[in-house]
Every structure is written in C-alpha cells, then in structure tokens.
C-alpha cells in the first residue's frame, strides 16, 4: 500500500523536503524502523529511542537497493536519499493514516486488558482461509507498532488486523483515528496496567476509545461475561456502531461458548451463534482448538464473532484452529526431564497481571500430580501492586501448589503469608534466580509433575522459561522456543 504514494507525495503528506533535492526514482513497498530488516525498495523511519537513535544507521542504507530514509536530521555522509521532516514518528503516523484511508481491505481492530495478542493471532489464522491477510506482528501495538503495521501492508491485502494497546488514557483514541476500523473488539476489562489508572472504570473508559473513529456502519464485538459489558455497549452505540455482537459463556451471548472439553491435543469447543438476520435463530458448531488453557476458548469465540461481522463463514473460520497450538510464553507446554524426573512445563511467561495470573493458576490446577510455580513480579500495578501480589497466596493455597520460587520484592513479600507446608525459595531478581535455578530444581524435581512459569516481561520470567527449555527439554523444543521468541 505504501507503493501507492510517490516520493513527492510522501514529502507533501509529511510536509518534508528531500535532502539536497535528491528525490528517489522509484516507489517504496514497505517501511521499517530497524535498519537490519531493510529490504529492496523499503523506507527506513529513523526514530529516536531511549537507548538507540535510528539516525545513527542511515549510513547503512543502500541506494543501489532503492532504500531511503525519513529523518529529522540529515546525514551528509549517507548515500541513500533522505526525506527531512520535523518528526519521524509523526511522519510515520501520517503515512499510516493515508494508507488506512486508501485501502479497500476490511479493517479489524482489537484491544483488551488480556487476551488481545492471542485473539489477534487466532483471527489472523482464521482470515487466511478467505484471502490475503496482514496483521500486527507480535505485540507491536503502540503508537509506533500500530502505524508500522499499516506501513508494511502488502498491496493485495483483503483483511487487515491491528492490535491496539495502551498504558494511558487517550492512546487508543489516537490509534483508532489512524486506523478507522470497520470491526472493533474488546476482549475484556481487567487490571493489567492499572498502575497508570485509578480504577477499572478508567481502564474501561480508555479501552472504549477504540470505538471513537469507527468507519460508517462499524461493528463492535464485546465480552458479554464482563462486568463492564453494558457500559461498553452504551459507549459503542454512542460512538455510532451500527451493529453489536457479544461473545462469552453468558446465556445472552451472541457467540456463546457452551462447552470446552480438554482432549489429548487441546480442547473441543462448542459455540452457539446466530445465523439469521434478526439473530433470533442459532446454530451450533463444534470444533477443535490446539490450546490447553480454557481462557483461550472464550478468545476463540471472540475471533469467530469478528469473522461473522465481516460476513465470513463461521464454520470455515473455525476449522483453521485445529492446528492453532499453544504459543511459547502464552501457555505452551514442554516436556522436561530434570534429574531423571519427567516434568511438564507450562510456559506462561510472556506477561502477567492479576487476572491472567489467576487464569494460569486455575489452568495449572487441572493437571494431575504435584504442581510447582516460578513466579516473578507483576509490574505496572501502582498502588494496587501489594494487594494484588498478596492475593496470590490465597489462590495458590486453593489450587494446591506444592512449592514456589518467588522472584522480585513483591513476590517475595507474598511468600510471608503462604502456609507452612508450601516450600518457598525467594530471589531479588531473575538474574540471581538463574544462578541458583538448576540446584533448586535438583532438590524439587522429585516432588514436581507440572511446573508453571509466569510473570511480567520486565521482571524476567521469560528468561527462566528459556533456560528451562534450553537445558532440560529436547533440541527440537528448544529450537521451537528460540524461533518464536
């Protein structure tokens, strides 16, 4: 889609000038913010970050490969053409909005306190059954990643899926204004990032910004089980949504999950969904999902609702999930052997908040045998942090955890109120924990059948999982994790 804009149109849109009048002779097919990923006919956006400045890498661009850059300060020694602008980030956002306005692809947007990245990945998988699909890579969902998704969209894209994240109020409104989605979903309202807010209501307000820039006739997809459903429904209507679909286990859900049974290779799900214009008649579909944690079942219902909102066949979409397996860091299981003892690792180390932590513990409880956990601090909880961590003590007692390795000051404080029979080992950070992890596990392995690793990315839980898979799993599993991380 970037190729629809000539170099001069790029300059006009961004209110910029090509350095020394050197205007490229060809158009660009995509933008990058990492010079190492640059390919032929691509445009490098030189951004100034906290630790790196993209302007330092302009000299690496190759004009012979039709590469150029958008810059704030030109590099006279660079051979590639440079478009000088006041703000490289603002230029990226302007170009992305122009692409969003020009595309004929159906534009999907989704956000939520938990589950948005996994739901995005499921939706992406489903949509590929119907045509070329372009989606947010990983969790590139902020004011850089979301515009970059648009700037990398191929010309033939029929379905565009953008994940929108936020840490503060107003951020989703800005991203929605760039994208102008036709179909917008909220997975749930929960306490992730609550440290930046005063209440869950404020989080609901911020998530509802998703509907602020609907295209005409937009459809909202909402979590029927959520406490804030009625509020979100009203917000979507006020924003001009012409249609609202709900998902969940609630009897009034349009896409109602009625069954989720764990089977050998994942889960078997049954979802009731409307098939007539007035949504008064329902059909039932049973399908397989190659995931093990039950919260993925509701996410699947959300993705199905998004497909239906686009007029796509629900049954065809559902078949795409039969091989949609557990994702590293989001509940994927690995078979470990520690000291001759077989242990199943539940790698949920991608991130953590109070709601997702409880879901992970509930999922662990469904596995038979003795269960251990390695938990690192949940971050960005602000004044709610202490209580959120202390609550875990009750939850772990209820699900019958045998032992815990606690990483970080908040998790360490939580262990003070655990029952005497639950063995605890505490470390100040993941670096120290890694130094002693092998000897700890040598002592704990005999009393462990299943092991959950979970925590915020910033507190290093993912480093623990990477070490466990690399050290105690098969070569193929280790390679799989490395490829996905």
What are the functions of these language-model segments?
Residues 49-52, 327, 349-426, 477-485:
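Active-site beta-alpha connecting loops in nucleotide-dependent enzymes
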Residues 83-87, 424-433:
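Short acidic-hydrophobic, aromatic-tinged amphipathic segments that line or gate anion-handling sites
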Residues 8-14, 91-224, 230-241, 439, ...:
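Phosphate-binding loop of NTP-binding sites
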Residues 60, 98, 122-126, 320, ...:
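Rossmann-fold NAD(P)-dependent oxidoreductase module
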Residues 75-79, 185-343, 369, 394-403, ...:
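Acidic, Mg2+-coordinating active-site environments of NTP-dependent enzymes
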Residues 1-94, 98, 292, 312, ...:
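N-terminal leader/targeting and accessory segments in enzymes
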Residues 10, 42, 61, 95, ...:
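Residue-level signal for inorganic ion chemistry
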